[in-house]
Amino acid sequence: MILTKPVPLYPPYIDLCDFYLDDYPELDKIFSSNESWWLEQFNWGKIFLTYIGRNKSSHTYERFRNDVERFLLWSFIEKKKPIDQLRKSDFLEYADFCWQPPVTWIGTSNQERFKITNGYSSANELWFPYKMQAPKSLKAEYVIDKKKYRPSQQTLTSMFTAVIAFYNYLMAEDFCIGNPAQIAKKDCRHFIIDSQVKEIKRLTASQWEYVLDTAVEMADENPILERNLFVIAALKTLFLRISELSERPNWSPTMGHFWQDDDENWWLKVFGKSRKLRDITVPLDFLPFLERYRASRGLLGLPSSNENSILVEKVRGQGGMTSRHLRRIVQSVFDQAHENMCSSEGKNKALKLKEASAHWLRHTGASMEIERGRPLKDISEDLGHASMATTDTVYVQSENKKRAESGKRRKVD
């Protein structure tokens, strides 16, 4: 079976842990009818991704899977050369390929990799290695031209990060003797040295007011939507990442993770980025939102430290919610808030609500606290940043403010 177009290679981590080629007849046929190194290097990818899935977050697994999969597909279909024989020039050629892949490798929507047919997994024909979507605020009128696909600088950096890590793993296991991706990175012509002033992706005070008021109105009208209000309030007020509210294989957020110290201060214990466990201060203004969400679930008062009720519970089914489901909740509130603000204030003032993602709530909360004058060190610790310098760079931008202030005094004459 000659492979002329890309097919998915690796399933989700939970399925990869119990992976047998017999369950994937198409892949089995592809590997049995092509050169032996295809299967060998597919297995290298499988071993590496199993390691990543076991030791890193689900988000990191998915990101590394995307990049390892693309790299192997390119080596099979386009380069026709084993990855342990690639040199620096070959990898720079791959970087060019990633910068402008063939339109036949580009899709326009999120798709599952595999579908189940008669008990076996087969490739989803609607899946493609690369994805090009309309900007969030322009989806209705945007026409997608795949020829104009270009990865962002972040996507390009992520590709190098993943493939360099892949090669490092293969070197440690004695499968490879060099890392062409590492050597090629500094000579990749598509990287841009970015020294721009970064705009914080956040909502204005007015936009946040519409989001909160909308969430309150929705919850008042339908008790099931108390969950939406709680999620919105928690992400903004407690500076949470969406994953920190989600159910994960190694962490299940519970009501008991809210706790009170001897001075009656409230805290929330979260399992965050880089497997870091931290405690976040919980302001008094947030407690009524916690209480009303608990009341909607039949839980009385504020949580006790030994309470094991799921923090954000599914309405149907058991257990906590995934990051994907939580994002949908946030998006539903943003959409309604955008509609409300458009009606009252006009489209221009509401535009950011069309662009916003769940992570903007974390940025919004932190930015507002800085404007309020709260000590940067305290905000940094609540955010879970490794250093206060990170918080300053992202939110305060002290040096840029000094430069802007001094720049105002320049004269024309």
What does each of the following model-derived ranges do?
Residues 153, 210-242:
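Basic, Lys/Arg- and aromatic-enriched nucleic-acid-binding interface segment
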Residues 393-413:
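DNA/chromatin major-groove-contacting recognition/catalytic segments
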Residues 328-381, 385-388:
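Short, basic (Lys/Arg/His-rich) helix/loop patches that form interaction surfaces
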Residues 247-292, 298:
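Conserved tyrosine-mediated DNA breakage-rejoining catalytic core shared by Y-recombinases
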